Amino acid sequence: MQGVIRSFVSGGNVVKGSVLQHLRVINPAIQPSVFCSRSESTQPARMEESGFESTTISDVMKSKGKSADGSWLWCTTDDTVYDAVKSMTQHNVGALVVVKPGEQQALAGIITERDYLRKIIVQGRSSKSTKVGDIMTEENKLITVTPETKVLRAMQLMTDNRIRHIPVIKDKGMIGMVSIGDVVRAVVHEHREELQRLNAYIQGGY
């Protein structure tokens, strides 16, 4: 994955209860109270736009289908890390949205597989006795994007901050989440189409 990312980024320039026993879907109207000032809207863009740099996060979410349109897996701050990781494994995802117990519209943060590795495995802690709220990334520290954010900009944010999942915010509410895999696939797709257009031009197709 890092190899793919490096092929697009060089020197700052773009070449172009026990809950989780079952699937739970979060309310798309979830309202975070505060979002970090490091979000997409406040960081200076450092990436050059190219002809194919037109795909937005909204396009990425649409391509993922209904599962990404306001719905995602979640857990609560009181759930054990063990149950959270079990859910990630069962559903083949790398992160869960975290909400406050009994308040499905109150975003508390997110927990990722990286949180588990760094804060449980490396530190020798018990995943069965540690609560999600103890190791999650709190909502006021989240890096975020909007549906209008360009995919290359989102990829820059994710690589700069060394994160693999990023919440999508609209009107102060969280409407979804995309991963670095989603973003890279979108960039590769756009890059491939651009190369095809250039090839057609060279061969007289235009």
UniProtKB/Swiss-Prot annotation:
InterPro entries noted in UniProt: CBS_dom (IPR000644), CBS_dom_sf (IPR046342), CBSX3_CBS_dom (IPR044725), Diverse_CBS-Domain (IPR051257)
Transit peptide range per the UniProt entry: 1-39
Record keywords, A-Z: CBS domain, Mitochondrion, Repeat, Transit peptide
Cell compartment(s), UniProt: Mitochondrion
Every CBS domain range: 61-127, 136-194
Gene Ontology CC terms, in alphabetical order: cytosol; mitochondrion; plasma membrane
Major location (coarse): mitochondrion
GO biological process, one term: cell redox homeostasis
GO molecular function, one term: cobalt ion binding
Entry superkingdom: Eukaryota
CDD domains assigned to the protein according to its UniProt record, in alphabetical order: CBS_pair_bac_euk (cd04623)
PANTHER family: CBS DOMAIN-CONTAINING PROTEIN, CBS DOMAIN-CONTAINING PROTEIN CBSX3, MITOCHONDRIAL
Name by which UniProt lists this protein: CBS domain-containing protein CBSX3, mitochondrial
Taxonomic lineage of the native organism: Eukaryota, Viridiplantae, Streptophyta, Embryophyta, Tracheophyta
